Swiss-Prot record:
Enzyme Commission number, as recorded: 1.14.14.91
PANTHER family according to UniProt: TRANS-CINNAMATE 4-MONOOXYGENASE, TRANS-CINNAMATE 4-MONOOXYGENASE-RELATED
Species of the source: Helianthus tuberosus (Jerusalem artichoke)
Gene encoding the protein: CYP73A1
Family: Belongs to the cytochrome P450 family.
Binding site for heme: C447
This protein's name: Trans-cinnamate 4-monooxygenase
Length: 505
C-alpha cells in the first residue's frame, strides 16, 4: 500500500473515531439495545470477538449474554437470536419486518448486489423472483418429473463404486463421485444436461470455479474490511479476485448453458404440453419482461451454490455418521431389507414408508446442520424484538444449530441418535413445525429447496447403505468428523476415505 493511501486511511480513522463517539452517545439515549460485550469506537466488538463468527462461538456468547445479544462489528449491528421463541418472532410473527437480507462486500460481488433471489431485499423483486423460481424448481410436480433421474444417478454411483477395486479394500473418497451425482441432479433440472464422468473438462472447470467462489465467499478472512470501511483498502486484492471469479462463472453459465438452451429453444419450439427444464421457464419470464438477463444468470448462480453444495454436505455428513455408528447403519439396512426386500433398490416413493431412514436424515440435519445460522436476515426499519430496540439495517442471525443442540431443549443433543425422531421428538419435522428444529428455516425466506433435498438425501443414503457395508479405512476405528464453518455454512473439514464393501444378495 502506498504512503498516500496510508495517510488517507489514518485521517479517515481519526475522523471516524470522533464521529463514532458522537453517534454512540446519541444512539445510546435513543435505543434500548440488547445486551452484549461493551464496544469500543470504530472497531466495536471486533477486537474482542474477531472475524470467526461461527455457530459455536456465537453459542458461547449466548451463554454469557442471553438468548438475544448485540455485537457492534465496526459499523454494523449484528443481533444473534438463540431461542425458539425469538426465532419464531424473527422468522414468522414479524416475518415481514425481518424479512430482508443483508449482504457483505463479497456477496455484493457474487450476487450482482442482490440481482438474485436468495440475497435480494424483501419486496417486489424478491416476490417476483420467488414466483418465477418456484414453478420450475420447487413443486411436487418437479419431484415427480425428475425423481427417476435422481434414482438413475444414485444407481450410477453404486455401479461406479462397485467397479473400483480400491473401494472394498483401502477405500476411496466417495464424496468425489457424489459431487458429480449432485451436479447431474441439478443440471438435469436446470438445463436437461448431465456430465458423463468426473473427468469431463466442462465439469472440472465448473467445479473449480464454484469451489473457488465458495472458498472466497464463506471465508471469515474478509470480515474486518466489511465491518470497518476504513480498513477496506486492505481488501483490494481480495475483492479483485472475487470479481474475477464471478466474471468467469457468469460467462461460463452464459456461454455453455444458458445460450446453448436458447439455441435449442429457437430451433425446436416446445408447446405447453411438453416437459421443459427450469431454464426454459426462466427464459420465458425474461421474454415477458418480468426479469432481465442478469437476473437469469444470477438465478443459475444461486442454484449452483445453494442447491448443489448444501445437499452434498448433508449427504457427506450422513455417511460419516453412519460409518462411525455401525449399529445405526445396520439398523437402517435392516429396515431397507425388511420393508423393500434384499436387493430391491429404494425409489423416491419408498422414502415416506421408511421411518428409520427419515429419522437418520433428520438427525443428520439436526447435529450437522449445513446452514447453522440460516441465511442472515435484516430489518429495513427500526424494530422491536424480545423487548429490545433493533436499529434499522441490523444483521439478524438465528443460531438454528444451537436451537437444535441446546441440552435444555433436547435429550443428549451431542449424541447422533436417530431414534429421538421416532420417540420423544416423533412429531418434529424438517419443515419448521417446531422452532427448535429449523434446518431449512421457516416463513417467507425459508429455503424452498427442502422439497428437493429430502428425497435426494433419502434416495442416496438409502442406496449406499443397501448396497455396501460402509467402514473406516484399515487401521482406523472412526473417520474424522471435525467441522469447518463459514459465513453461514458447516461442512466436514476433511473429505474422508471410506471403505465400501459390496453386499451380496
Amino acid at each position: 500500500m502506498d504512503l498516500l493511501l496510508i495517510e488517507k486511511t489514518l485521517v479517515a480513522l481519526f475522523a471516524a473515531i470522533i464521529g463514532a463517539i458522537l453517534i454512540s452517545k446519541l444512539r445510546g439515549k435513543k435505543f434500548k439495545l440488547p445486551p452484549g460485550p461493551i464496544p469500543v469506537p470504530i472497531f466495536g466488538n471486533w477486537l474482542q470477538v474477531g472475524d470467526d463468527l461461527n455457530h459455536r462461538n456465537l453459542t458461547d456468547l449466548a451463554k454469557r449474554f442471553g438468548e438475544i445479544l448485540l455485537l457492534r462489528m465496526g459499523q454494523r449491528n449484528l443481533v444473534v437470536v438463540s431461542s425458539p421463541e425469538l426465532a419464531k418472532e424473527v422468522l414468522h410473527t414479524q416475518g415481514v419486518e425481518f424479512g430482508s437480507r443483508t449482504r457483505n462486500v463479497v456477496f455484493d460481488i457474487f450476487t450482482g448486489k442482490g440481482q438474485d433471489m436468495v440475497f435480494t431485499v424483501y419486496g417486489e423483486h424478491w416476490r417476483k423472483m420467488r414466483r418465477i423460481m418456484t414453478v420450475p424448481f420447487f413443486t411436487n410436480k418437479v419431484v415427480q418429473q425428475y425423481r427417476y433421474g435422481w434414482e438413475a444417478e444414485a444407481a450410477a454411483v453404486v455401479d461406479d463404486v462397485k467397479k473400483n477395486p480400491a473401494a472394498a479394500t483401502e477405500g476411496i473418497v466417495i464424496r468425489r463421485r457424489l459431487q458429480l451425482m449432485m451436479y447431474n441432479n441439478m443440471f438435469r433440472i436446470m438445463f436437461d444436461r448431465r456430465f458423463e464422468s468426473e473427468d469431463d473438462p466442462l465439469f472440472l472447470k465448473l467445479k473449480a470455479l464454484n469451489g473457488e467462489r465458495s472458498r472466497l465467499a464463506q471465508s471469515f478472512e474478509y470480515n474486518y474490511g466489511d465491518f470497518i470501511p476504513i480498513l477496506r483498502p486492505f481488501l483490494r486484492n481480495y475483492l479483485k479476485l472475487c470479481k474475477e471469479v464471478k466474471d468467469k462463472r457468469i460467462q461460463l453459465f452464459k456461454d455453455y448453458f444458458v445460450d446453448e438452451r436458447k439455441k435449442i429453444g429457437s430451433t425446436k419450439k416446445m408447446d405447453n404440453n411438453q416437459l421443459k427444464c427450469a431454464i426454459d421457464h426462466i427464459l420465458e419470464a425474461k421474454e415477458k419482461g418480468e426479469i432481465n438477463e442478469d437476473n437469469v444468470l444470477y438465478i443459475v448462480e444461486n442454484i449452483n451454490v445453494a442447491a448443489i453444495e448444501t445437499t452434498l454436505w448433508s449427504i457427506e455428513w450422513g455417511i460419516a455418521e453412519l460409518v462411525n455408528h455401525p449399529e445405526i447403519q445396520a439398523k437402517l439396512r435392516h429396515e431397507l431389507d425388511t420393508k423393500l426386500g434384499p436387493g430391491v433398490q429404494i425409489t423416491e416413493p419408498d422414502v415416506q414408508n421408511l421411518p428409520y431412514l427419515q429419522a437418520v436424515v433428520k438427525e443428520t440435519l439436526r447435529l450437522r446442520m449445513a446452514i447453522p445460522l440460516l441465511v442472515p436476515h435484516m430489518n429495513l426499519h427500526d424494530a422491536k424484538l424480545g423487548g429490545f430496540d433493533i436499529p434499522a439495517e441490523s444483521k439478524i442471525l438465528v443460531n438454528a444449530w444451537w436451537l437444535a443442540n441446546n441440552p435444555d431443549q433436547w435429550k443428549k443433543p451431542e449424541e447422533f441418535r436417530p431414534e429421538r425422531f421416532l420417540e420423544e421428538e416423533a412429531k418434529v419435522e424438517a419443515n419448521g413445525n417446531d422452532f427448535r428444529y429449523l434446518p431449512f428455516g421457516v416463513g417467507r425466506r425459508s429455503c424452498p429447496g427442502i422439497i428437493l433435498a429430502l428425497p435426494i438425501l433419502g434416495i442416496t443414503i438409502g442406496r449406499l447403505v443397501q448396497n455396501f457395508e460402509l467402514l473406516p479405512p484399515p487401521g482406523q476405528s472412526k473417520i474424522d468428523t471435525d467441522e469447518k464453518g463459514g459465513q453461514f455454512s458447516l461442512h466436514i473439514l476433511k473429505h474422508s476415505t471410506i471403505v465400501a464393501k459390496p453386499r451380496s444378495f
